[in-house]
């Protein structure tokens, strides 16, 4: 089977200003230069060069088709001499991120007409995965049947894609049943034996569904199989439980993790910090943070961002600001996500003017402000009952070239509906119409829910252990846990 670039690998830096002919000529010239290379390290350099050139060419193709300038197939036809399987694979990845599943099918049809095309499991697996993420279950199943008709024999990666596809469907109980059906079928085929990716997909899915019984069955099956769990296994399950607020179940996975001699990484610490923060178990959250600082792992931006967000939701402004101080003290420069977290924190704490000050600083420090930052400030106004200010901000950012998304309009529509401001609602709908955004049923149902919510914003009651100053300032010092849970702390797992 052909080897393809991993989906998690970052693309090389962009090259701007490339014209069509020069881009193709550069690709062919580089190929000729690679043929002349000799000496140690030539193979590694060649592989890196090939990946960079392929990514560069794919970006060029997508630039040519952006905004409906040209059809992608027409662009591929003009460069047919240099396009190969690896370029199409990269196109599938990028089009999948851009909701371009129909274009993926067009590229696939184009591929099949080329002399160099050979039916391959990797291509079908990628396409099935893309269709699944976009909810195109029938199309994914059609591709699976096409793969078998083309002479390809399904392997583990194809079945993993099928399982992931069904888990994206709306009927979760039916999806889980189908996923288990494929899992059992895989066990009966030698070339399709479940691997750790298969188990990780299923374990996370059942954790998200809160099905602890099936989760225990899968863990037992994993223990009896030749496959060994990895850090992704435990992190995936703990994250799913944590996001569902199932803290006891999350802690039981932590115990299982230690019993299998698997050391936590920074992702593990971040999951625990966020999960305890969501439940406002701040004593445990701070204990995990101290354990992180004592371990070989180092905090990351998400570590601090999560703490700021969760303290903010509990309206603990001083604690959130102490986290920011600790972050700066440790040499971390707040990124735009941190600033968005601060905007929301101050919004929860009734400090809209301070939130706007941070937003203005963010705008002045960046050439292109992320739409998520705009949405954060709009949300800050809306949750504090300031729809007029939100509308004025929207006017301002649109004049500067920002293009609101459906999520932007959704949060504003809910706020304007809650405020019963018909004038702003009409203005917003006209904007949506001019931008070609058509609201669906869910859009209006979510807005109707706003009528039932009479509070200005969620008022959460801090836990009794969270009234004091945060422990982040003294996190480097040893401390004892006064709470009864968890029975096993992260620093004990890491020991």
UniProtKB/Swiss-Prot annotation:
GO terms for molecular function: mRNA binding. Residues 1-29 form a transit peptide. The keyword Nucleotide-binding does not apply. Residues 462-495 have a biased composition (Polar residues). One of its GO terms (cellular component) is chloroplast. Residues 1-24, 455-495 are annotated as: Disordered. Keywords: Chloroplast, mRNA processing, mRNA splicing, Plastid, Repeat, Transit peptide, Translation regulation. Pfam families: PPR, PPR_2, PPR_3. It is found in: Plastid, Chloroplast. The keyword Plastid applies. PPR repeats lie at residues 120-154, 155-189, 195-229, 230-264, 265-299, 300-334, 335-365, 370-404, 405-439. GO terms for biological process: mRNA processing; regulation of translation; RNA splicing. Involved in the biogenesis of the plastid translation machinery by promoting the splicing of group II introns in chloroplasts. Belongs to the PPR family. P subfamily. This is Pentatricopeptide repeat-containing protein PPR5 homolog, chloroplastic. It comes from Oryza sativa subsp. japonica (Rice). The lineage of its organism: Eukaryota, Viridiplantae, Streptophyta, Embryophyta, Tracheophyta.
